[in-house]
Each structure stands twice: as structure tokens, then as C-alpha cells.
A protein has these predicted regions:
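Bacterial N-terminal signal peptides
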Residues: 1-8
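Preference for long, amphipathic alpha-helical scaffolds in soluble/luminal domains
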Residues: 12-311
Length: 311
């Protein structure tokens, strides 16, 4: 199966790109995409945004699995982690499906509950904003919410969580690469607000200073591919060229740094020594970062701006 996928991708005679190679690997590894973080929502999101030709049946299988899961759970994907809704909304939007009507349930409605979304921490806020903005969705009324959310409330929540020296973190007092990059992704659409623009510039300065001499990034003590992938997505969402001098160290760009983690199979590893083997999360994040680069290079809307699908 993998061979046939790769042959079909290279049939045009052009050298296979890393994007094509990884797309083939992912589809071969996950024959039936399910619901969830790995081998599901992010995989579908990445494939749909990559521009790679994917059989419609593959996306249909995913959607049918989402419908079944939503029906089985009576519309409640999680009572605690509202990123479950956000991630599903992003994947559904990417394949042109309406998240407001899935097996009779509106998956946008939970994202209108400000307290429940933010209770999860900064991740909840980041991905609620990305999900709502992905298709320029109106925030529906949520009669069960103690506080009805607005976009500006989520933007302000992110601004209040900025660290004194710039950047953002999940816990503690030092800026975290991944969280800072993801926050910048969510704020990218709001840069016309002076406070947001200033916070974004501080965040970019932090990411530039945290970049290693080899062009990579360290998070939780190890140089890893996921952190590099998130920085790439942040830069492309903000329209910052990947060869911007702030993000080139010793001649190495963030794209160069990411590709160091690529394996011959098309997979990516979490850490450079490959000690964890081919890694599902690392591969999916690297893949959608490559999709973000491809979209920037070909003049398409950004990875998270899915208004092109809505037209």
C-alpha cells in the first residue's frame, strides 16, 4: 500500500517532496482515521490543508467515525477538556463539513462557554480561538454557560497571561516555546489591535532568543521536532518569512531544522537521535508545518485560515 501510494505521488516524474512523502507515510500507517489527537483529527486537518490529493473515501471514513462518536457520547466529547471540541472543529472545517451540525449536535456551542474553555488553561483558550476563527464562525448562544464568550474575551485572556518579559507558558515563570508559538498563532488575526501587535512582537523576540545555535528549539530539556513545527506555523500565520534573520542561526532556518528530524520512511522522530523511533505526534505536527510552508509559498490562505474551504 505504501509503495503504491508513493508511486502514485511520483508518477508525474518530479522528485517527491517531503510533504508528499510524509502524506504517503501517514495514509499508509493509518488506514482508517479515527477520532482523537493521533491518527485522527490532526492527521485529517494536515492532509486536508496540504493540497495533496487524498481519496474522498478517506475523509468520509473520518467523518463517519466522528458522527458515530458524537452520537455515542450524546454530543459531549469531554466535560473537562474543551480542546476536544476545538480540535474536532478544526478537522471538520478543513474537510468542508459543518461543525454546527454533526449527528444533530452543534460542536461550536461548547466553545461559547468562557469559563469551561478557560478552566482547562491557556491551551483551551488558544484552540477555541483558532477553531472559531478557522471558518469565521459566529459564536452561538450557549444557555448553559455561566459566562457567554466573545472573541475579544478570549483575546484579552491570552493578553493577560503574557509573561512580564514576553511569551507565554503552561505553568511556571519562563516562556515555553510551544505555548508561545501557539499563542501567536491564535493572536495572528488580531494584530490590528495595538496591544496584540505589541504582545506579538514581544513573543517573536522571545522565540528568536530561544532558538538554538543549530536553528532548532528545546522544550522540556530536549531539542525536538514538535517545538520547531509550532514555531514554523506561528511564523507562517503571522506572515513572517522563514528566512527572516531573526530566525536563522548560523545559516540554518527553522525549515532546515525541522527536516533534520525526517526519516527515509517519510516519518519524523521526536528527538534527533531517534531513540523513540518514528513518532506519530511528531510526524503529524511536522506534516502540518510543512503544509503551512507550502501554503505560504503558493500564496494560499494560512494553515488555520480556512475561509478558502468555506467559499
Amino acid at each position: 500500500l505504501l509503495l503504491s501510494l508513493l508511486l502514485s505521488l511520483t508518477a508525474c516524474g518530479k522528485p517527491e517532496t517531503q510533504l508528499e512523502k510524509t502524506a504517503g507515510y501517514l495514509q499508509a500507517q493509518v488506514a482508517e482515521p479515527g477520532v482523537g489527537s493521533i491518527g485522527g483529527d490532526w492527521l485529517i486537518f494536515g492532509l486536508a490543508r496540504s493540497g495533496i490529493k487524498v481519496p474522498q473515501k478517506y475523509f468520509d471514513t473520518y467523518y463517519n467515525n466522528v458522527e458515530a462518536a458524537v452520537r455515542e457520547k450524546n454530543g459531549v466529547l469531554s466535560e473537562r477538556k474543551y480542546t476536544e471540541y476545538s480540535r474536532t472543529v478544526l478537522a471538520l472545517t478543513a474537510i468542508g463539513k459543518d461543525p454546527a451540525s454533526v449527528a444533530g449536535f452543534n460542536l461550536l456551542r461548547p466553545l461559547a462557554d468562557f469559563e469551561q474553555v478557560t478552566k482547562q488553561g491557556i491551551n483551551g483558550t488558544i484552540f477555541a480561538l483558532l477553531a472559531l476563527d478557522s471558518g469565521n464562525y459566529e459564536i452561538p448562544e450557549n444557555p448553559n454557560a455561566a459566562v457567554q464568550a466573545t472573541r475579544q474575551m478570549y483575546v484579552d485572556e491570552l493578553l493577560t497571561r503574557e509573561l512580564p518579559d514576553g511569551g507565554w507558558t503552561l505553568t511556571g515563570g519562563e516562556a515555553d516555546v510551544d505555548i508561545t508559538a501557539m499563542t501567536l498563532q491564535a493572536l495572528a488575526k488580531y494584530r490590528e489591535q495595538p496591544e496584540v501587535e505589541a504582545a506579538v512582537e514581544r513573543g517573536l523576540a522571545v522565540l528568536s532568543s530561544l532558538q538554538e545555535p543549530d536553528g532548532g528549539y528545546v522544550s522540556w530539556g530536549s531539542s525536538n521536532s514538535e517545538s520547531v513545527a509550532q514555531v514554523i506555523v506561528a511564523l507562517t500565520e503571522l506572515g513572517v518569512p522563514l528566512d527572516d534573520e531573526r530566525f536563522v542561526k548560523n545559516g540554518v532556518t527553522v525549515e532546515d531544522a525541522l527536516l533534520r528530524f525526517a526519516q527515509e520512511s517519510g516519518a519524523f522522530v521526536h528527538v534527533l537521535d531517534g531513540s523513540g523511533g518514528d513518532d506519530g505526534m511528531a510526524t503529524e505536527q511536522a506534516f502540518y508545518a510543512l503544509a503551512a510552508i507550502h501554503r505560504a509559498e503558493t500564496g494560499k490562505t494560512t494553515l488555520y485560515d480556512m475561509t478558502d474551504v468555506m467559499q
